[in-house]
Design a protein with these regions (language model features):
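Ribosome large-subunit tunnel/peptidyl-transferase-proximal elements
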Residues: 1-104, 114, 132-143
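C-terminal structural segments of small proteins and small subunits
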Residues: 103, 110-132
Length: 143
């Protein structure tokens, strides 16, 4: 039995998908976006080829965190210098930069290599319902 592998030239035609995050858990939206960005929803998925599609996430302001995660969960960044750990509570992160919170969640779900880096360039997060990609005619994805 032979396995058909996708070639990078075959993956040039990428689709656009839009996900509405209003009232949905942040992690579930991020997980669905990561699957599409990686290309795992396709029958022609090949692990060493970047075969993912574009994902637009709208209404990031209305995404919810379940339980007590708003108060107890932190986003941590470290500059590499001693004592330079910065912690941001998700309550303030969701209030100020909800699109960044969604981006951080998706980034943690894609591989940390060149394919994951390319996949993250195809992620477009917006706080409100309007976006600048209507000309691409994105398909709606239900969660």
């Amino acid at each position: 039995m032979s396995t058909t592998l996708a070639k990078p030239a075959e993956m040039a035609d990428r689709k656009w998908y839009v996900i509405d995050a209003a009232g949905k858990p942040l992690g579930r939206v991020a997980a669905k976006a990561a699957v599409i960005l990686r290309g795992k929803n396709k029958t022609t998925f090949t692990p060493n080829v970047d075969c993912g599609d574009h994902v637009i996430i709208i209404n990031c302001d209305e995404a919810v965190l379940t339980g007590k995660k708003l108060e107890k969960k932190f986003h941590r960044t470290h500059s590499g210098w001693i004592g330079r750990l910065k912690e941001t509570q998700y309550k303030t992160l969701m209030a100020e930069n909800s699109d960044k919170a969604m981006t951080y969640a998706v980034k943690g779900m894609v591989p940390s290599n060149t394919i994951g880096t390319k996949a993250m360039t195809r992620l477009h997060c917006y706080k409100a319902a309007d976006h600048a990609h209507a000309a691409q005619k994105p398909e709606a994805v239900e969660i």
